[in-house]
């Protein structure tokens, strides 16, 4: 059973009928993904329809955000209340030297949009707390 078949059974990301067709540019961009039998075009449509919220735009969140954007995840949310520091640059690959002193979520959002302008980025310059979790995760 492919991931698409399991998604149909489990109802993940909605039914195939509700998925918007990929544009010509998206078909070209994600052609290699669509060749994978477990993904195909409908799987790429589901990836585009998905939403991911990353807590932290640092050492782990930074590369994850880039790979998610490259894969075509439709919406990437970022939560981080920190600023880019020069000591971050050797391991937080989403940030550039010019971003030092800027909020990490702003720097990361800019890099994500540069990599894949079709991805919606929602930046939250805050920490995830019990008080704001429902609003941020909802």
Task: Give the role of each language-model region.
Residues 1-138:
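Adenine nucleotide-associated cytosolic modules
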